[in-house]
Structure formats: structure tokens, C-alpha cells
């Protein structure tokens, strides 16, 4: 797909489809007269009772000799309620209507509202996000949407062209995350995941890979224990984007990367086990974020740390009741081998905090089914030891439509993770609050001396999280959220 920005529409552009944006109850639409000089559209509005309500649309086909063959009118909703997210969603809703088009013109400056470059950028992003599909393994190929040419007509064309590079960077990060999560586990194991991270080096990201021998020397027995039952080797991958000042401490993002999770000896039910190929979505989000930041040359120092393992049953697999000593020196009683993500993160978080010494850490993981029970598929769970970081994440979530909801942490929950035969239990039984106790477990490896947040994305990373601008099984959730967080609160600071 090719995107262009022009200040004026010319009939010589030879487009076959035009898209016009309609503010609710507003009489006119920018560009409508240019492509519909005979006023056919307004007559159709009356017949269809189209008033420009958000999410509604009218599609008109024109006879040969008309300026365009097809006109798509998209409702933006009420004037006072329109924002960047309105344009993001409208762009996503628009894309399926363009499946037969070749050259499209979008009149992006809606009449009745103050037009801003960010609105055009969000429309373009929504359209591009919706265009993603994962069909690598289908043998019957459909039309290649990449041949589509779209020209946005806007007063801010020159500025839009400059800012579009950032949109492409974010899009690349989101789509990379989707690709990683959508890939089947027989294609994307730990070795292959490492190779994907190393491709970030072309963007200027430094990539360090810690293999099994190195992890053993570091004492990462919590992470290593999860990998015991699999023939695939474990890794810790450290990615660095150093776009800020030389002496500036980095911000860090840590991701759970279980490339397939059978549950181990505590075997999962067979129903929907195939979805466990997506249990590395936290790591995939971190990789996608690093891509986005590097591609847009973010002026900030950022670390991405991911623990890569496969959780399989086998004669050498970790057993319920095993006790392991983590890199921190704290001992962990493994009550449930299917509570493995927190074991991986325990060592990854400790390594990140003590060896890399960032000024802030955020971890992401498809950690608990309990978060889905609590929040469903609309919000990710947020846990933190820092009120300011919570405010930043909540705001970024609202702005990007990747929303987070804060849960409590505290001593009354912390004591629930005390172990019977070791310092900590990886799965407290009979207390409820499964997502909270999982977060309290992680907090044992971070403490209170560094701002930290844990985002449980089990309900939003894949499966049910489809919306106006995403039709993929994998949602790519978190890349736009964290990119906004970095840009607004940590870049150029």
C-alpha cells in the first residue's frame, strides 16, 4: 500500500474511489462537491437517513463518466466528541470498503471541526493497522492490498508527509508484534525468536544474547527450570536503543517469552491449548516497541529484556514441589508448573534491575487467566509501586485506546506468596486474587527502590481483542501504549 499527501484534489489524479468524512448533522462535507457535482450523495443521505453518526457509512456507485466510480462517506459523530481516536477507528472502518479499489482519494479535512495533522495521521494509522492480515500459510492467495494507492487531501499535506515516517515506525512495531504472536510454535521457537530480535540491528538496536551456559553462571535457575522439559534452549535477550544523552539512565521494558506453554507437568486442558503459541506476547510487544522507537529514532535510551523458554512436559521437566534458587538468591517453591511466566520474569527482572540499572522498569506478560475473569478483553491489568508511573500509563492507555486498569498491591497480598518450604510460592492456593498475587510475586524481585509496573495482557494480546482497526488474532496491544508513554514522558527529558 502506498500513501501520499496532497494539498489539493485534481481530476487528473484519476482515482476510482473517494472517501469523504461527515460530521454529524453538519450540512457539508469537504471534497464532496469535487467528486459529486450533481449532488447525488445528499439525496442518498436523505433516503438512507444518514446523518454522520459515528460508525455509520454510505457507499455510492457512480456511472461511467463520473469523477469517481465509488464514493464512501464515513460518519465521524458529534462535533464535540470527535478526537484522534475517532479518526483512528474511522480509518480502520474504512479499509474493508476499499478492497476492490486501486487508487483512492481521502478528503481528510472534515468540515465542522478544527483540523489537525494528528487526525490525519490517526486516520492513516487506523487504515494501515486494519490492512494487516496473517495469511502466510494459506495456499490460495487473495488480491494483494499492497497495490492500493491512497492520497490524502489536506491543508496540512506538507507536515503530514513529514510526520508519516513516525506512523510507519509505529505501524512496523505493531505489525512485528502481531507477526511474532501469530506464528505457530513449530516455526517460531526460541532460536527463531532470537533471530527475529537480531534483525533489529539493522535499525541500530544493539542485541546481546545470553545462552544457557551464561544463564547458569548467573544463577538464573527460576528461568532455567521452566525450560528443562523442552529440547529448545532458553535465552535472555537484551536489546538496547541508545538515542538519548550518553549519561542518561535508560527506561526498561521486560517481556515474558514462553514460545509455547503446555503447562508442563501441570498440563493444561487440550481445549484451546493451541492458543498457547501466543504466551510470548509480552516479549513480542517489547520487540515491537524496540522496533518502533528505533525506526522513528526516538531521542531516549531504552532497554528491552526478554526471557525466552518453552514449557513442555518430559522426563527432565520441572515437577510440582521442586524448589529452585533464583538469581536474586530467593528460593521458590514450584507449586504449579503452569505458573511459569512469573518464574521467567523473576530472573529477567532481577537481571534488568541489578545488572542494567535502569531508572524505571515495566514488564509485560500474558500472566494470568484471572485477569481475564476480572477485566475481560478490553483492559489490561496494571500493577505498580509508583503512583506517577500509574498516572502516565493510564493516560497513555486512554489516548491510544490500549487501556489499562490498576489493581491493588500491599502487605496483605504479599504475605500470600510466602512459601511453605521455600521463601516464595509460585502459586498460592485457595486465596483468590490470582492476578494480584502473581504481581506480588514479581514485586519480590523489584522492590520499592525503582519505579516499576507490571502489565498483565492475557486478555488483550490475542483472540478476543478485535476492534475497528484490528481484525487479526494477535492484537499487537502495548506497542502504541508504550510508544506514547516514552514519547510523552521520557523522551527529551
Curated annotation (Swiss-Prot):
GO terms for molecular function: manganese ion binding; metalloaminopeptidase activity. It is found in: Cytoplasm. One of its GO terms (cellular component) is cytoplasm. Mn(2+) 2 binds at residues 256, 261, 279, 340. It is an enzyme of class 3 (hydrolase). Its cofactor is Mn(2+). Its main location: cytoplasm. It catalyses: Release of an N-terminal amino acid, Xaa-|-Yaa-, in which Xaa is preferably Leu, but may be other amino acids including Pro although not Arg or Lys, and Yaa may be Pro. Amino acid amides and methyl esters are also readily hydrolyzed, but rates on arylamides are exceedingly low; Release of an N-terminal amino acid, preferentially leucine, but not glutamic or aspartic acids. Keywords: Aminopeptidase, Cytoplasm, Hydrolase, Manganese, Metal-binding, Protease. Gene3D superfamilies: Leucine Aminopeptidase, subunit E, domain 1 (3.40.220.10), Zn peptidases (3.40.630.10). Its EC number is 3.4.11.1, 3.4.11.10. Binds 2 manganese ions per subunit. CDD domains: Peptidase_M17 (cd00433). The active site is at 268, 342. GO terms for biological process: proteolysis. PANTHER family: CYTOSOL AMINOPEPTIDASE, LEUCINE AMINOPEPTIDASE-RELATED. Belongs to the peptidase M17 family. This is Probable cytosol aminopeptidase. The gene is pepA.
